[in-house]
Amino acid sequence: METPAKINLFLEILGKRPDGYHDIRTVFLPVSGLSDTVVVEHATPPGFELHCSGLPLPANEDNLCWRAAMAFCQHFHISPQHRILLEKRIPVAAGLGGGSSDAAAVLLELLALEKLQERECELWELAAALGADIPFFLDPRPAIGEGKGERLSPLSVHEPLELLLINPGFPVPVRWSYQHAERPQGMQPLEFSKLMDILQKGSCKEIAEAAWNDLEFAVFRKFPILQMLRSSLIDHGALCVHVSGSGPTLFAVCNPGSSAALQKNIAGEFGEFASIFQVNA
């Protein structure tokens, strides 16, 4: 199963919850052109195995795929006798939801492998307990996320978006981004009702102008190289540049047909350390 990355086109922090999480309102968009691959099969001899290739990842309980498999087996009273093969291409701890996407794929593949499709409705609760982004990846289509991000409403987006994703090569923990989130005084996101209207009727340029992320201000302060990347992307014609999720990956919304040239320009300046992906949302 191919497991897509995502961006958060819009992310607004509404407040902190008693459980330590934050209430947010976000717009999830899946992207085509950057994904991992997850295969789940019965293990022979019986036992549980996780094999990772591609980008380095732990193949133990620190891996969300492992935890998803254990949670599934416990919930459905199944002995964990499976082999998971994970080919990792989405950058890790990057704000692109790669681990969450992989975990959702494990849940879905186990459901099919164990012929439990009639109980698919039970996956949402499992997914939400594992991570706030994982429910989105059970059915990765444009959506509004509320609560911790796990309460989803379908969303139609009028214009497909041509994007560059630029990952600077270092991770940023989700916890750090939320702990240090601070919106500059006087800055406000667009009213959500207006954002919905733009997403459903607006042009690519109007959608780009409505993008927002409350987490990015702290990330830009902490890592000046990201501000340099952002400035260069804007100088070379990007319509907007924002941090995706908790970062540090940047997404640049491009004029239609311009992403290849922009990728070439940015690779010439920053390609020695940054990974650049040309994708669509």
Task: Please provide the spans of the model-predicted regions.
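Contiguous, small/hydrophobic- and glycine-enriched helical/loop subdomains that border
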Residues: 81, 103, 107-144
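Solvent-exposed alpha-helices and their adjacent loops that cap or buttress functional pockets
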Residues: 30-32, 128-129, 135-138, 154-159, ...
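ATP-binding N-lobe of GHMP and related small-molecule kinases
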Residues: 1-94, 111-112, 116-124, 148, ...
